[in-house]
Structures are given as structure tokens and as C-alpha cells.
């Protein structure tokens, strides 16, 4: 299957792609995601366990990648209409009405991305702006290299860095 064509891609196309490949769609353009490193997976597993335990018995649920988040999908959209689909490392969704068999329709309440060398620019710039535009209320960027967690919250439609935690503070 050729991955590049002149037209924009949609969720309908993505649903036909090899499920073993990590591919995101950003405004109709496919973005190949590199396989994560061991440390990346260890951090995600630790965060997943903490969030799962914290949210137990609450209405919010945490979902690890692969989990298709269609940030701008509306209720009446067909797969052919959806041109943006990301697979955050962790997503917290508090509205069960946003969930379907594929993943999440609309913005999750919290997205966490753990940086890898190959995704650092993508997560800090492209996804930061994308999540802000989609109205994701809270976005955490975890940097294993810097040993930091940047917590940004949406205020008047723009992200503001609320906290920058270091390994010593955690």
C-alpha cells in the first residue's frame, strides 16, 4: 500500500492501514511514529498505573496508546470527513459519550506525551499547537532526558505552563 498520495488522508484511509504501524494524521497528512524506547514504555507504564489507581471509581478513564483520538470529530462526521487522528501516549477521558470502539471523538480532558528523541519537536510544537486548537484542557509533556514534567492548562483558549516539575520535586 503506498502511503503517499496527492490527496489528503482521512480516518477512512487510516482504518485500512496496518495496525502494527503507529501512524497519526495531522490535517490529512500521515505522520509515521517511531517505535518507543524501553525507558519511554517504563514511564508510560508507571504513569498509567498511577492514573488508573487514582481514577478508580471515578467517571474519568485513562487510555494508553494505541488509542485513536479524533480531536475535531463532530457527532455527524463520517470517517471520510475526519482528517486528524492522533495517538497520545496517555489520554484521560471523563465524558463516556466521547468514547466509541475506535477511541475518542473530540478532545480528551488530559493528554500526556512522553518525549522520545524522534518525537520531541513533534510533541513540543505540532501537537502542543494542535491540542491547544482542539481545546484539550490539560497537556503534560514528560521529558525523560531533562527529567521534567511540563503541565500546561488551557486558559482563554491558550496554553499556559502551570508547573514544571523536576525529578527532584516529584
What do the PLM-derived regions correspond to, one by one?
Residues 1-170:
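Gly/Pro/Ser/Thr-rich low-complexity, intrinsically disordered segments predominantly at protein N-termini
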